[in-house]
Amino acid sequence: MASNKFLGQGLTYDDVLLVPAYSETLPREVSLKSRFSKNIPLNIPVISAAMDTVTESKMAIAMAREGGIGVLHKNMTIEEQAIKVRAVKRSESGMIIDPVTLPETALVSDANLNMQQYKIGGIPIVDSNKKLIGIVTNRDLRFEKNKNRPIREVMTSKNLITVNEGTSLQDAEQILQKHKIEKLPVVSKDNTLVGLITFRDITKHFTKPNANKDKYGRLRVAAAVGVTSDVLERVETLNNAGVDAIVIDTAHGHSKGVGVVVKKVKNQFKELDVVVGNIATADAAKYLVDIGADAVKVGIGPGSICTTRVIAGVGYPQLTAIIEVSKALEGSDIPIIADGGIRYTGDIPKAIAAGADAVMLGSLLAGTRESPGETVIYEGRKYKTYRGMGSVEAMKMGSKYRYFQDVEDDFKKLVPEGIVGRVPFKGDLNESIHQFVGGLRAGMGYCGAKDINALKKNGKFITITSAGIRESHPHNISVTKEAPNYSPS
């Protein structure tokens, strides 16, 4: 067999350890700021995966509040995905610049529907010229039994408290407290509604200072699209809803079809960052950057629920893949996202030292309260369902496009590249993020890295044997109390 058939040895996270170095940096002093894509920053280098048991609006909101970003999955209609984008963008803001409004001809039922759909507690009422004429809150509707009653009969219109454009959050907070109200409409000189400030948003602004927000103070969110005939329609709808970035999400990003879609999207939506994946080689990375990708996503088969490597016989050990892609993109200013294979918090600094700017997590987030997976009880313990987007169940819901099987209508003929399982329930996301960030900070402290770029530039590895792996884990002892950030697997 020709020697050029073998490209060398491939390593993954368990095959290496980071080498400790002289340090003048304490873990609590390091900066975790990084990038999701060329123009989208991160305050922590953690991203939730575009999977239908991982990221919907609740997860995306929670991720952005912690400083990361969530990628909404595509297994839903275009409008459903856009609604979830708007839910994230409206969940909190310094000032909501496009608040949900209703005309004075609306009914109580219309207000109830909008409050439920967008998870909001108040709606400004405007006339045909967008002039503010009142506001209705959930307190106005709480005991209203006549759902067909006109909204103008229940809204607050007299002595309406408003502020002018340019009012600071500090001043707005004082006005809200003085008048004991929770919603403060912002109007122009001619009383045109231009925004809405809420007490809840002000509180979150000060309690979550690390939140990842856009220039308007809204939480950031990304959304996945596929190589499909309606991709431009989907991207346009998502863009109009306020999405911060698009992820063109396929199992094999180094392909002609992906290239065609990337060029179309970048040509029509020049202001929108486009992340493209998945890939695993230097050639693939160069290809995606040449066609306009604003970030690349690395990972062919490393995920815990992915069977691509054993079904198709194709893949690339994740650590080596990140290193190869990083070398290929050196000097390009294109961020690299390491997608899949993260089992322990220590794998995060390994991925970054290999060249990644951020990691994308699936299984480690699927057990949190904010994930959309079903909660189940098994043998007295609580779990949440978690499935690969290549599983038959997910492909039936729409992800078959990701594996280039979108022309197959007979579900029995689908060739899955993923499985369905369950993961232990972990509670609130912020508790898990605290452990992930703590492990990363510790790793950076050991390596003397004051920020993400320093870890990428100076991190060094040593390969270890199977004996080294055993030595790395607790051994020669029976664990009697589980740690919050470790479980044997």
Feature locations, PLM:
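Alpha/beta catalytic cores of nucleotide-metabolism and tRNA/nucleoside-modifying enzymes
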Residues: 1-22, 102, 164, 171-174, ...
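Active-site-adjacent beta->alpha loops and helix N-cap segments on the catalytic face
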Residues: 28, 77-86, 144-148, 192-212, ...
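Bateman/CBS regulatory modules and CBS-like beta-alpha motifs in cytosolic regions of diverse proteins
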Residues: 28-42, 49-51, 80-118, 125-127, ...
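Short beta-strand/loop segments at the ligand-binding rim of alpha/beta enzyme cores
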Residues: 41-48, 94-99, 214-224, 266-280, ...
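Catalytic cores of alpha/beta
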Residues: 58-61, 233-241, 274, 280-298, ...
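Glycine-rich phosphate-binding active-site loops on the catalytic face of alpha/beta enzymes
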Residues: 65-80, 189, 243-255, 294-312, ...
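Catalytic beta/alpha-barrel core
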Residues: 72-75, 101-102, 122-124, 162-163, ...
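Short beta->alpha transition motifs characteristic of CBS
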Residues: 72-77, 120, 124, 132-147, ...
